[in-house]
Regions:
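The alpha/beta-hydrolase serine catalytic core
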Residues: 96-201, 206-228
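Catalytic nucleophile-loop/oxyanion-hole region of alpha/beta-hydrolase
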Residues: 44-69
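Short glycine-enriched nucleophile-adjacent loop
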Residues: 83-94, 100
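Alpha/beta-hydrolase active-site loop signature
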Residues: 13, 40-45, 107, 206
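Conserved alpha/beta-hydrolase
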Residues: 25-47
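Alpha/beta-hydrolase fold nucleophile elbow
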Residues: 69-80
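Short beta-strand element of the alpha/beta-hydrolase
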Residues: 3-11
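The serine-hydrolase catalytic nucleophile loop
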Residues: 12-25, 183
């Protein structure tokens, strides 16, 4: 297969059957590039309990995929939480990362958008009982937010200091994203020190970033990065 390969990192509670993952797999087949999509522990086809997971464990899953299933440099394409995990991979394994694309990347969301939005009663409940439930617009079932997710993700917050990368970074973000506001993307851009970092804001795109034009934009970015 052509080098570099591409690894797709999905979002929280998503699975590798999502629109973006399947689209990129087809793109890779057509272009002759190696491509990997996978499920984190407790997601999709993978074993394990979702509520026992955190950024710490899902980052380890991604690290295992990078180390054991790929060779050479990789383009990391991270959606939502996967954008946070892609940043961690680039930070810990810079020699293996060709470039990084964040799609509605959600670094530090467990702290900035979950914990910081909880009132005292919710914080007390999650600490004492181990979890709370929060409505989700993506499924009828509410999200189960665990104490594990909050506590163990704190070891891996990335927006508390500068992120120094030598690889190119592309951030794609929609204006109609109800989960990750555009400010998160601009804040991430501010924290990045990379010789080649760009943010593209797409008017009208939502958090799923899965319309035909959004998908084409993702593959266009990959094709441009391949030439670097």
């Amino acid at each position: 297969a052509n080098s570099p390969g591409v690894i797709f990192l999905g979002g929280l509670a998503s699975d590798m059957e999502g629109t973006k993952a399947k689209y990129l797999e087809n793109w890779a087949k057509d272009s002759g590039n190696s491509f990997i999509r996978f499920d984190y522990t407790g997601h999709g086809e993978s074993s394990g309990n979702f509520s026992e997971g955190s950024i710490a464990s899902w980052f380890q899953d991604a690290l295992s995929v990078l180390d054991e299933l790929t060779t050479g440099k990789q383009i990391l394409v991270g959606s939502s939480m996967g954008g946070w995990i892609a940043l961690l991979l680039a930070k810990h394994k810079p020699e293996r990362v060709h470039s990084l694309i964040g799609i509605a990347a959600a670094p530090d969301f467990t702290e900035d958008y979950m914990w910081n939005s909880f009132d005292d009663k919710q914080r007390q409940k999650i600490m004492e009982e181990g979890f709370i439930y929060q409505e989700s617009e993506y499924s009828e079932e509410p999200y189960k937010i665990s104490k594990n997710l909050i506590i163990h993700s704190r070891e891996h917050l990335v927006l508390r200091e500068k992120l120094i990368f030598s690889c190119p970074v592309r951030l794609l973000q929609g204006t109609d994203d109800n989960d990750v506001p555009v400010e998160v993307a601009t804040r991430l851009l501010d924290h990045l020190e990379s010789p080649d970092a760009k943010l593209e804001v797409v008017k009208g795109a939502d958090h799923s970033f899965s319309t035909e034009s959004c998908l084409e934009l993702i593959s266009l970015q990959i094709n441009q990065l391949m030439k670097k």
